[in-house]
Amino acid sequence: MADNTGTLPNVDAVLDTTGLYCPEPIMLMHNKVRDMTPGQVLKVIATDPATTRDVPKFCQFLGHELLEQDTASENNYLYFIRLA
């Protein structure tokens, strides 16, 4: 994962999975990336702590680039993913 804090590219789509728990955030991400094209950036907002483990594995498995993983607040997690 690159350390690009403050230099993230424009976001092409946002997926808000607030309030959802495993496996729903990953299932919704999988569906969302199908509607996007390679090179686009997806911002994911989550509240499930399991996403800190699941999102990086999702990216690694599918070849997407996890540009940034951040804890926006105690209960909010942000992910910026460039699609492969």
Model-derived features: positions:
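Short acidic/glycine-enriched loop/turn segments that link adjacent beta-strands
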Residues: 73-76
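Core SAM-dependent methyltransferase catalytic element
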Residues: 78-84
